[in-house]
Amino acid sequence: MKAFFDTIRPLFGGAMTQAQVDGCETLLAATAGLPLMHRAYLLATSYHETAHTMQPITEYGQQPYFNKYEPGTKIGKSLGNTQPGDGYRYRGRGYVQITGRANYAKAGSKLGVDLLGNPEAALNPTVAARILVRGCTEGWFTGKKLADYPDYVGMRRVVNGTDRAEMIAGYAETFEAALLMSVDVAASPAPDPVIKPAVEVPAPTGWGAIIAAVMRMFRRN
């Protein structure tokens, strides 16, 4: 793990807090088994979306700010908010902030967690990591999933269109390098050797048989 943190430390100004280290470790565990680029991009997304804290965060703003998410507003309707106070109650939370009653209900149903009744549970690092991983690999947020894109710039569409796509791609490249420094990448198995069938040489006949017999006599002598 030392090589991993040595590689990413420049992203954090040369030093990391224990909370940042803990957040990275939570995300490394949550993304284990995913393709290398997907792991790197999820780490980069968390780095960007949490303002480099690597901890689940709550969307910033006083309660009046979230009135724009209330039922009856254009945004509120798109988020599935139906009850007064839903805008603030279901404001953004997590590594990649889920927002709105409909999204909390969807994530909670898929994870088996009562996020509607307890939206603060989306701030639990383990729950937040599961939302991030499954949301990005299954296409919860925009209908796009990581496997739809072969490059880091394109992967931004999984979360938020093309907003800061190039910048986050740069972060992902750093996280990819860190993962390669710390994780044994299994080499492709060597192909099975090609065994050519034996070619049967017909036994010599006539003069060929006589010459072969003479050659054998000389070898014995």
Language model segments and positions:
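Generic structural signal for hydrophobic core residues of well-folded globular domains
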Residues: 31, 46-49, 99-102, 135-139, ...
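An amphipathic alpha-helical core segment
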Residues: 115-162
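Secretory-pathway/luminal and periplasmic proteins that interact with or process carbohydrate-rich
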Residues: 48-59, 142-143, 161-169
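Generic structural signal for short, flexible, solvent-exposed coil/loop and linker residues
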Residues: 31, 43, 79, 84-87, ...
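Extracellular cell-wall/glycan-interacting regions and their flexible linkers
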Residues: 1-29, 34-38, 74, 109, ...
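Peptidoglycan-targeting cell-wall enzymes and recognition modules
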Residues: 2-26, 42-135
